[in-house]
């Protein structure tokens, strides 16, 4: 860091080259590596199924109020397959170093002239993973922290967890091409989406299980709509695409 700051702020020619991508390896504790590029050139495709599926948007009033007051409760029901959702599980038949934006290619229709879709992709099943919240390694071991005080040294714990979020995304069907293009949603008319989820880098190995959850309202991140409509999915014309 000192070499980089000296080069950028002081104009010191020290020939330091910052790697294109610096990535914390999710398969081991305190392991950092550099990558030549962000975004894989190879794609693995996972068909979503053979049938059609429906997602109801409306919840009964008690459940809706519960989710509004506590979105972590909603997320827990989501991973447990208890919310209004479509849940799809996959087992990997090869090692995949996910690099870039996972893509959902979907055939969908809405029962009304609007529509919202949310998606979350999980590394699912008990395994050792990096936790999302840092834990303390050593108390007051860092000098000159906030307000020049000593701070705790923290690190993401590498511990067994039941699942780990890989990526997620949200799409308004009226902006299905891009955010600046408004398109009509014709009720009960099939639409084809190519939907890029949030970018990520994640190392997955053969035999790992992925869980894809598709739903409408996300009580943390989207408008909390409880009106009565549904989204239909033609799973036989839909797939998950992972770049690596």
Which role does the model predict for each range below?
Residues 1-244:
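C-terminal, loop-rich substrate-recognition/catalytic regions characterized by aromatic stacking residues
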């Amino acid at each position: 860091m000192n070499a980089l700051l000296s080069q950028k702020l002081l104009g010191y020619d020290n020939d330091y080259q910052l790697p294109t991508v610096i990535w914390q390896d999710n398969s081991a504790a305190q392991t950092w590596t550099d990558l030549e590029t962000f975004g894989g050139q190879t794609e693995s495709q996972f068909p979503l199924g053979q049938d059609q599926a429906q997602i109801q948007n409306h919840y009964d009033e008690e459940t809706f109020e519960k989710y509004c007051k506590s979105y972590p409760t909603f997320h827990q029901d989501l991973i447990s397959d208890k919310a209004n959702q479509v849940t799809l599980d996959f087992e990997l038949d090869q090692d995949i170093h996910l690099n870039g934006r996972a893509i959902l290619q979907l055939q969908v229709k809405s029962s009304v002239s609007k529509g919202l879709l949310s998606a979350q992709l999980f590394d699912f099943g008990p395994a050792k993973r990096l936790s999302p919240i840092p834990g303390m390694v050593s108390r007051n071991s860092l000098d000159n922290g906030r307000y020049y005080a000593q701070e705790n040294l923290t690190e993401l714990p590498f511990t067994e967890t039941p699942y780990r979020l890989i990526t997620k995304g949200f799409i308004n069907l009226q902006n299905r091409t891009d955010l600046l293009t408004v398109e009509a949603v014709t009720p009960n008319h099939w639409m084809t989406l190519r939907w890029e989820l949030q970018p990520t880098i994640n190392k997955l190995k053969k035999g790992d299980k992925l869980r894809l959850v598709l739903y409408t309202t996300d009580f943390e991140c989207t408008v909390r709509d409880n009106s009565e409509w549904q989204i239909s999915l033609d799973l036989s014309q839909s797939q998950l695409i992972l770049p690596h």
